[in-house]
Amino acid sequence: NAVAAYVRDCGRDVVIFPAGLEGKFSLEDTWCAGLILADLGAQELGDGARTAKLVCEQIDRHELVNTTHGKRLQNLGLHGDLAFCLELDRSSGVIIWDQASGWGALKR
């Protein structure tokens, strides 16, 4: 997992923040956060992180097509996009938000 590798290599504290959808909880974002935590082998977790990790362990990623956002993509006919989103380890790049500029930057 490129994100977990970046976190291990950066030597800093990192916040994993599931963005959600329109200000609401998002199962797929929480699942992804749990996957990153599992890949990191994180040991000391707060309640939110433990919940994310449990979500990832208990829900098969292919079930994420049934989430609110998954159904939205299906209704828009974006089946290829949805299939792409369900792939793991597709890229070695990680988008990092730069606080100073307010922009994301691709790190490899």
Positions of PLM-derived features:
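Long, charged alpha-helical interface segments
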Residues: 10, 27-108
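Internal, conserved structured core segments that host functional sites
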Residues: 1-22
